Structure formats: C-alpha cells, structure tokens
C-alpha cells in the first residue's frame, strides 16, 4: 500500500513495483477481464486487473495507471560504482510500476504480490482472494485477511479505525496485528517502528468477543519491544 504521494517538482513521479531480468519471456496481462501476451516494448495501462511474470502475479485491487516495459536495456556497473568496469552490458529487463503523473497530490496505490502462480486461470481465481483493503490514507493503512481472521494496521499518528467488527484507537503512531479467533480471545501484537521509546495506549473493542472496550498500555521505554 502507498498513500500521501505528493510532489511539487514538476516532473513525473512513479512507484516501481518490480524491475528484474526477463528470465521468462512470457508476460501476461489482464484488462477488462481479457488476457493478452505483452509484446516487447514500453506500455501504459489504465487499471489492469493483474500482471503475471515468471511465476509471480501482481494484482491491482484499486486499479491505477501502470507502466510496463519488456525490452533490452543497456548500462554499465560503472554508472553506480566507479570501481567497476565501464564495459556496457545488455540484458532483457521486466519493469512494472505506477504512474502518479506530475505534481501528484495525495496519490495512492495498492497491489498484492502473489508468488508461485504459473497460469492465467489461477490468476483469475485469485481475484476472489480473502484480502480486504479497508483503509489506505496518509494517516492509516488497514488490511484484513478474512479467512485467517488477521488484521494488520499501520497508524502514522493518533487515530481510530472502526467498522462493524471491531474498533481500534491508538494515541501514537504504531503498527498492529490482531488475530480475532472465534474462541472468545484476540491476540494483539504491536511494534513501535519509530523507536520512540515511549508508552503507546491501545483501545480495542471486538463486540463478538466482549461488549467492553479493552485498554492496553504498551511500554516501550526500556526494552523497545512489547
């Protein structure tokens, strides 16, 4: 997930999803539920459903303007490390990413990487995946896996997320993972990526488990972990 993509530089802004050697020549793309083989060259697509290359699928649940290239590229190791050779090398390269345009304001993107898939049929089936994106803003990003009952949340500042199944409030930026089993218990894991060495208060309400709001004070002041 990505959100809050901003720029005033007046030049095109992009997010690269992957760039790798074209180890497999076959690149398949699905757009408007029609699959096609991608030819050699540079291409732009408006909201394709998915792309498949070398056993790895890329699913785009929120659409977007994407660029894809499949071509021979030339360069030298010297361009990034002056102790290396200046000899030019050529390789076939696969590149995939999002175009945000010039001067984007609060642009977002979302994609799911699906390894171990080798056919268009399986990619079409994966579009019915249990992964739900419930929030993708510059203040919070929330994803849920419905089959596993796992919620993953990133709060970039104090905030509250709520829907019909749970409510979560935090008083500081943090990353959370919640597993809401149906046994009457929920597992909460929290991280402080900012390493602020402070206390973070989490308020959690899961009506299916309890009608009472649970408050947990997570103390990172000494160990940095909880």
Predicted regions, residues:
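Terminal accessory/anchoring regions of large secretory-pathway or extracellular enzymes
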Residues: 1-226
């Amino acid at each position: 997930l990505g959100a809050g993509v901003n720029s005033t530089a007046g030049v095109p802004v992009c997010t690269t999803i992957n760039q790798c050697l074209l180890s497999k020549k076959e690149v398949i793309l699905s757009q408007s539920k029609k699959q096609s083989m991608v030819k050699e060259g540079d291409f732009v697509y408006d909201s394709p459903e998915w792309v498949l290359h070398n056993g790895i699928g890329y699913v785009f649940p929120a659409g977007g303007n994407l660029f894809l290239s499949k071509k021979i590229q030339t360069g030298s190791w010297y361009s990034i490390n002056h102790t290396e050779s200046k000899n030019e090398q050529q390789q076939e390269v696969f590149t995939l990413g999002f175009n945000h345009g010039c001067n984007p304001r609060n642009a977002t993107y979302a994609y799911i990487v699906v390894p171990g898939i080798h056919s268009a049929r399986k990619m079409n089936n994966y579009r019915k995946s249990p992964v739900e994106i419930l929030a993708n803003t510059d203040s919070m990003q929330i994803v849920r896996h419905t089959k596993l009952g796992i919620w993953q949340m990133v709060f970039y500042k104090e905030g509250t997320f709520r829907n019909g199944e749970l409510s979560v409030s935090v008083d500081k930026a943090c990353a959370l993972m919640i597993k809401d089993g149906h046994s009457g218990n929920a597992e909460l894991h929290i991280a402080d990526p900012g390493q602020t060495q402070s206390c973070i208060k989490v308020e959690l309400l899961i009506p299916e488990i309890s009608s009472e709001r649970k408050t947990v004070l997570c103390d990172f002041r000494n160990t940095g972990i909880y």
